Structure formats: structure tokens, C-alpha cells
């Protein structure tokens, strides 16, 4: 196969992106002041340090939320096409659901759902 056309298109696209970025940096107005580098919080002036550590519990809840959010992202399309999939589709989604329930049981047993 001849990939010359593909290489030319990719190089042209990269060159275009590079020119646009360079042009925007060259002609964009700049204003350096202290307020530009402060964290913006709902229009209210910040109190204390802007960068602070969060407890690990927040990250654990976020990961659990993402896990079950992805579950619903898989369940909705499955529900739409479940009539066309037949028994094999039912078995596969049940297997997927059982794995997620086992993951939830494991997180519950380890105390991940309790705020400490």
C-alpha cells in the first residue's frame, strides 16, 4: 500500500496546528499580575492557601463512583438491544453485573463506603 497521501495529510495537519498555536501566542494580549495566578472560587476571594491536600477518602469515593458510572454506561445500551442479543447477551451482562456486585461487596467489606 502507498501511504504517501496519508503522510502528507498528517504532516499538513500538524503544520497547520503548529502555525495556529504559534500565531495565537504571537498576537494574543498578555497581562501579568498577581490576580491572574490566584485560584478563582465562585467570585469569592480565597482565604488561606489555594493548594491543599484532600483526604484519600475523596479519591476512593471518586473511583467507586466512576466504576458504577461506567456500569450504567454499559447497561443502558444493553437494555436497548437486549432483544436482539439473545441468551448469550443475557449471560454476558449477568456476568458483568455479578463482577460489579462482587466489587461492591468487597469495597463494603473493606470499609471503603464508610467515611472515617
From Swiss-Prot:
InterPro entries assigned: NAD(P)H_OxRDtase_bac/plastid, NADH_UbQ/plastoQ_OxRdtase_su3, NDAH_ubi_oxred_su3_sf
Membrane protein topology class: Multi-pass membrane protein
Transmembrane segments: 3-23, 61-81, 88-108
UniProt key word rRNA-binding: no
Subcellular location: Cell inner membrane
Catalytic activity: a quinone + NADH + 5 H(+)(in) = a quinol + NAD(+) + 4 H(+)(out)
Signal peptide: none
Example of a GO MF term: NADH:ubiquinone reductase (non-electrogenic) activity
PANTHER family in alphabetical order: NADH-QUINONE OXIDOREDUCTASE SUBUNIT A, NADH-UBIQUINONE OXIDOREDUCTASE CHAIN 3
Free-text function comment from the UniProt entry: NDH-1 shuttles electrons from NADH, via FMN and iron-sulfur (Fe-S) centers, to quinones in the respiratory chain. The immediate electron acceptor for the enzyme in this species is believed to be a menaquinone. Couples the redox reaction to proton translocation (for every two electrons transferred, four hydrogen ions are translocated across the cytoplasmic membrane), and thus conserves the redox energy in a proton gradient.
Family: Belongs to the complex I subunit 3 family.
Entries under HAMAP family matching the protein: NDH1_NuoA
Oligomeric form and interacting partners: NDH-1 is composed of 14 different subunits. Subunits NuoA, H, J, K, L, M, N constitute the membrane sector of the complex.
Official protein name in the record: NADH-quinone oxidoreductase subunit A
Organism (species): Bacteroides thetaiotaomicron (strain ATCC 29148 / DSM 2079 / JCM 5827 / CCUG 10774 / NCTC 10582 / VPI-5482 / E50)
